[in-house]
Every structure is written in structure tokens, then in C-alpha cells.
Amino acid sequence: MAGFPAGVVNIVNGCGAEAGSAITAHPGIDKIAFTGSTITGKTIMKKASETLKSVTLETGGKSPLIVFDDADFEQAVKWSHCGIMGLGNMGQICTATSRIFVQDTIYEKFLEAFHEQVKSSTVIGDPFDENTTHGPQVSKAQYEKILSLIESGKSEGAGLLTGGARSGDKGFYIQPTVFRDVKPNMKIVREEIFGPCVVIAPFSTEADAIERANDTEYGLGAAIFTENLRKAHRVAAGVQAGTVWIDSSQDTHWGVPFGGYKKSGIGRELGSYALSAYTQVKAVHVNMGMKL
């Protein structure tokens, strides 16, 4: 690999169940860093424990995005859309803000504006076409999983604002899907979907927003929209997430530590802080003259 001496960067090709398992169990490897599902992360931890390897895990997420009624409304709508359906990833990003909580005083207004944002900015098509903003899902298995979760939302009584089905008759394309009137125990609220599906629910107070945001087994990312910076920092302190954006979403910088709380992982990637996970601390004591 360009820029590195021979032998520093080595690539082992193969499927995770074979190549990944062998790497995790190998006694000559001291450190494992993994990005992927929570289930796979747990498996890696078990195998790594046999040789007491150090592990860094960045796993699942179900990130909240909170919009207060004193936020810059237009920007909040655009960033909220970006957080789940923007950037050309169709929700296929671990920090996707797939749970949007909007203060009840602007809830209906936000729903209308978000719906319009989806309609006006969605161009479904070939991902290699520069005009396309919404491409296919990564695989047939993921495509089917997303549609199954969307159907569960319908059957559990969530209100479908837009989307909710396949797009076209070719490829693994799914319509941008927005649910309203959801309940905390619904699958679409609790499970990571990893697709273009978002739930939008109202909240009343600051404490209510924090409680709803933390009502998840994950804690990877969160976003907060308010013009009151003191309030933003209070909420950021109360939200259980490794990364918190204030008045933005998904704009993580490579120099800033990244990782999660709870089932979203262990340790941090990126930034100088992450380098410590690849080092060992050694204490060397030198006797400068003490005699026994």
C-alpha cells in the first residue's frame, strides 16, 4: 500500500465467518478493530477472549435527532433529511438518525415540511448517474429485511406518511419511507433498519426529549437542533451517545474520536485518542540510589 513500508499493511481476503474468525482466534494477533453488526461484534468478543485480545467495536445504532421549537426550522428539516436519506446512502450508515423527535408545538408543521423535502430531493435511479440521489440497497437480503420491517410498522399501526414499498420493478430499490404516530415498542422504533425508513414522533419538554432519545439499546450518534446553545449542551450531556451533533448531522471529522455507548460498541476509532488502543502502557522503575 502506497506510503507504508512493506509488511505494515496486510490484506487477508475472505468472508467474515472464515477469514475474520481466523484473524480473531490467531494467537499472533494482539488487537482487533471491527465495524459492523452488534451480533457479529459479540461473536468477535467471545473469540477474542480466548487469547485476551484487545478489541475496539463500532456496531449498531438507532440514532435520535431532536428538533426543538426554537430551532432554525428550514435547516432542521434539511439536516434531518440528510441524516437518514441524504448523502446517497439510503439509510445505510450506522449513525443514521432514524428516530426524529420534534417538539409538539411544531410537529405537524415539521411533518409537512419533511414530506415535501423527501419529494423534492429524491431522484431514484442508477447510483452512477450524477443526478441520482437515491440508489438501491446493498443486497437482496438487506432489501428484504427493510421491507419486512416496513411491513411490521404498518401492521403495528404506525401512520405511513410516504413511501412504504418497493420502487419500480427492477433492482433492490425502496421508496423513502416516513412513519408518524409511532409507539415506543414498535419494531421500526426499536430495531436498526439500515435503510431509507424514518419514524417521526412528538415530544413535549426537554426532559421528555432526552428520555425518548435514550430509550434504545444503542448509543452511537445523536443530533440536536435549537438556537439555544446552553440547552443544546444540556441535552448533549444527557443523551447517551458517543457522537452528538448540534445543528447538523453526519458531519463527523476524521480527527474526532468516534464510537458508541451501550450496544453500539466498545472503545473509539479516529483521532489521536483512538491510537492509544493500539499501544501498551509500560512503567519502568529505575533505582537511583536507594539501598537495602
Give the residues covered by each predicted segment.
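Conserved residues at the C-terminal ends of beta-strands
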Residues: V12-C15, T35, G83, T226, ...
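Short helix-initiation/N-cap motifs at beta->coil->alpha
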Residues: G16-A19, G61, S204-E206
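Short hydrophobic/charged patches on amphipathic alpha-helices used for structural packing
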Residues: G20-T24, I210
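ALDH superfamily catalytic-core signature
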Residues: A25, K31, S37-K183, I246, ...
